[in-house]
């Protein structure tokens, strides 16, 4: 997606070119709501953000001038509540991808608050902005020699019961360990006895998830998975989702013009509009539409052992610009 360009003035007076996206992802690369709420509020006030390419170290800029939607990704947005009024005052649309896992016994998320506190934050956010705007992610589904799919699904169901009425959708993925060598190395260094999901185990988990989804009235979606789980009522997800945007923000003409304001009369027959705005920079099995991510790799201090966005756990730097 080629977004429009504009110019911004930096504090030192320099004029720089900036991309002006309609949809902003904050962020697949780092947990901005958990760690950088003050930074984000300042950037929102300034109207732009700088982003450093991790490979060539070049800084590029993203302007918020035309932004109509922020999609936030977080495991613990407790400190982000003071930012919400600033978004509302600017009439900016937003929703959250809230990852709420239960790996306390395994220590896979060492710097997370206690699970009960995170559940409370989820419920509070849902009451503040509405359950349809807080998408629950149990992501990734992770198994070990001790944590079988059956035990894992017991944890998923426990959370589903606590989140009943506070969300409409459960999104999951199966841990991709061998795909990311740094993740494999980090798990090995942490002495985690991990197991890979085979197609048989994926189907076994999907069967149990189907039961949980029906019991707690949750839409089930898989994220970036090649395996077809539609037989269990599980559709491929679009985390940055034109259908959800259409449902939540139909009164925003700019968003509707971008995604197409009406659904196709015969779904699946004409998806030319979706294909035009699909984010081609993501993995093949990703269904997201185009957005601009404003996070930086190696800036999340939460230390999750399975994280792909930090090269070395515990060695991060603050997000800048």
Outline where the language-model segments fall.
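Conserved Radical SAM active-site core
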Residues: 1-109, 115-131, 311-321
């Amino acid at each position: 997606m080629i977004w429009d360009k504009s110019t911004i003035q930096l504090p030192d007076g320099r004029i720089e070119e900036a991309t002006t996206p309609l949809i902003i992802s904050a962020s697949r690369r780092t947990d901005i709501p958990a760690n950088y709420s003050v930074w984000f509020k300042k950037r929102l006030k300034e109207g732009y953000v700088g982003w450093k390419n991790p490979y060539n170290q070049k800084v590029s800029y993203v302007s918020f001038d035309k932004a109509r939607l922020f999609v936030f990704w977080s495991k613990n947005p407790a400190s982000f509540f003071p930012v919400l009024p600033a978004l509302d005052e600017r009439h900016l649309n937003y929703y959250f991808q809230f990852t709420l896992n239960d790996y306390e016994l395994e220590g896979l998320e060492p710097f997370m608050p206690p699970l009960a506190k995170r559940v409370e934050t989820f419920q509070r956010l849902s009451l503040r902005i509405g359950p349809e705007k807080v998408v629950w992610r149990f992501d990734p589904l992770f198994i070990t020699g001790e944590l079988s799919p059956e035990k894992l699904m017991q944890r998923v169901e426990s959370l589903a019961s606590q989140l009943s009425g506070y969300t409409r959708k459960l999104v999951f993925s199966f841990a991709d360990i061998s795909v990311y060598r740094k993740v494999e190395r980090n798990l090995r260094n942490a002495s985690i006895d991990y197991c890979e999901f085979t197609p048989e185990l994926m189907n076994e988990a999907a069967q149990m998830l189907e039961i949980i989804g029906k019991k707690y009235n949750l839409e089930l979606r898989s994220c970036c998975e090649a395996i077809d789980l539609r037989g269990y009522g599980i559709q491929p997800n679009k985390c940055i989702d034109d259908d959800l945007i259409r449902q939540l923000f139909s009164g925003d003409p700019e968003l509707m013009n971008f995604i197409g304001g009406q659904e196709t009369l015969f779904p699946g027959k004409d998806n030319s509009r979706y294909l035009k705005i699909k984010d081609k920079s993501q993995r093949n099995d990703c269904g997201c539409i185009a957005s601009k991510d404003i996070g930086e790799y190696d800036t999340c201090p939460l230390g999750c052992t399975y994280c792909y966005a930090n090269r070395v756990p515990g060695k991060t730097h603050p997000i800048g610009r």
